[in-house]
């Protein structure tokens, strides 16, 4: 998990929940389109972008490759691959907007694109145009590609241990 001083809660997202939430996002985006294409922010935006591409019948999908997180913390922005143009007619997709650092960097590169995320936290929410679910700033979202199924102690047992 990430920095324990920054994240007090955990929000596990299953593959099924992510799919439902991304389909809900597609309903909101239908009235904004059609889009020329989708730009997925790697790596978190890849799965939502694939679902949105299917639901919105978008065949052109590109990526912006940015590194800002590791499994422990959020760091500085490193653009590994950009995209040409100003983003007009394009849909930018990411799984989450947290502090807004990554989103602001992408906004600077593609100022005319429509920016959508599945999940949004209060600090980053103003940077995106469309999102589905808001979670508190102190919540770590555990995405299905970052986890595996394992046994977890019942809450009452964990409380007694701690």
Curated annotation (Swiss-Prot):
Guanine binds at residues 98, 141. It comes from the Bacteria. Its main location: membrane. It is an enzyme of class 2 (transferase). Homotetramer. It comes from Oleidesulfovibrio alaskensis (strain ATCC BAA-1058 / DSM 17464 / G20). Keywords: Cell inner membrane, Cell membrane, Glycosyltransferase, Magnesium, Membrane, Metal-binding, Purine salvage, Transferase. This is Xanthine-guanine phosphoribosyltransferase. 5-phospho-alpha-D-ribose 1-diphosphate binds at residues 43-44, 94-102. Pathway: Purine metabolism; GMP biosynthesis via salvage pathway; GMP from guanine: step 1/1; Purine metabolism; XMP biosynthesis via salvage pathway; XMP from xanthine: step 1/1. It is found in: Cell inner membrane. Its EC number is 2.4.2.-, 2.4.2.22. GO terms for molecular function: guanine phosphoribosyltransferase activity; hypoxanthine phosphoribosyltransferase activity; metal ion binding; xanthine phosphoribosyltransferase activity.
